[in-house]
Amino acid sequence: MRIVCLIEDTEGSEGKNGCAAAHGLSFYVETGAHRLLVDLGPSELTLKNAENTGTDLRDVDTVVLSHGHYDHSGGIMPFVRRNTKARIYMQRTAVGDFYSDDGESAGERFRYIGIDPEIADLPQTVAVDGDLRIDDELELFTVKHANHPIPFTNKSLLVRDGSGYARDSFDHEHYLVIHDGKRHILVSGCAHKGMPNIMEAYLGRYNAAPDIAISGFHLMKKTEYSEEEKREIGEIARQLNEYPTKYFTCHCTGMKAYEIMKSVMGDKLTYVHSGDVIPTDWI
């Protein structure tokens, strides 16, 4: 098994593999039966990073779009010009009118952050309704009940409807489970439904925790955290620490939140940068 972070918000140590950073996320995964991508970052830059890591995207057979935001989908249309065979799995609701409320001081307060609608019309796109078993190795699941708070940073993420803007419920978010021999790996994008809720849903579905969980935690802020927000981040870390899982995080977690969580979770939490390879041989 090989898992490579093709792009996220920070460059790898010492400019690892020459991979650039950008606000977005993409992982390449090799399993016994598949060559797959989870998200494709914000742009064609993801494809350039793939070349720098020696990843041949023409071999990819499966793409999973974690949710309907541009920073995870922007590389899809450039990708399909190189690879027309890979099936692209996304929730049917991922084609939505999604916006970010950037505040009163922004030049344009409500900024569109959804995907290119042409993605849904591609012949290789599979519109998923809820959970899906792809094959013996790959499954997709959704969170139907949230027993823990969702990230406080979700409050600025909206969906536009006929009467204006409403808080996004993130019913367009799903999570990939990889069963590769004895390894069981959970891959999420931003965990907008809350990583504790996702882990709880995984446990209820499989009656065990994953060996590895890879995800952004959507805790990044442009401004300083309040004391209450710091406490919430610490509580998320404590909840995740209860599972016998090794976590790899990136992208929308943000380094400040990562440092708070790292102080609680220690070696169970690692930050992954653009171009980094996630070790799996210890499982």
PLM-predicted stretches and their roles:
Residues 1-18, 155-167, 218-228:
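Glycine-rich phosphate-binding "P-loop"
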Residues 15-16, 70, 98-101, 221-224, ...:
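Short, charged, surface-exposed secondary-structure boundary motifs
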Residues 87, 169-175, 179-274:
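Cap/insert and terminal regions of metallo-dependent hydrolase folds
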Residues 34-36, 62, 138, 184-185, ...:
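Structural motif
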Residues 2-53, 169, 173-188:
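Conserved beta-strand hairpin/beta-sheet module of binuclear metal-dependent hydrolase folds
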Residues 8-10, 40-43, 68, 93-94, ...:
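Active-site metal-binding loops of divalent metal-dependent hydrolases
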Residues 45-96, 204-213:
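Active-site metal-binding motif and surrounding structural segment of the metallo-beta-lactamase
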